[in-house]
């Protein structure tokens, strides 16, 4: 799948299958995360096999089966949200090309501090659910350029 195909195919997915992500795909994601962290001055982390963040009353948004996710962390700065969005979307599109599904999550998660690291001068901006979706998601209406 090309990058343009990934852009067209990618839709948010909230329900995931109980299917392990193969080691080669994890390695490709970790390589991209390292690259984005270095260039973007971020601390993005891939959390695997952790189910607490998307369960319980705080899991607004009908998430199910989420056990892998990205935590989007960086040093507090005026442009942190912009960098998280820019580099996060690069990882999301790579995941799509590798056959995975994703969903950006701003508020619908429970913090699980033992699963990842957020330094004193850092902020957890959001999370991105990651895995094999029950479906490929559905496209939403978008406004035309005109």
Cite the ranges covered by each PLM segment.
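Acidic, surface-exposed loops and disordered segments
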Residues: 1-146
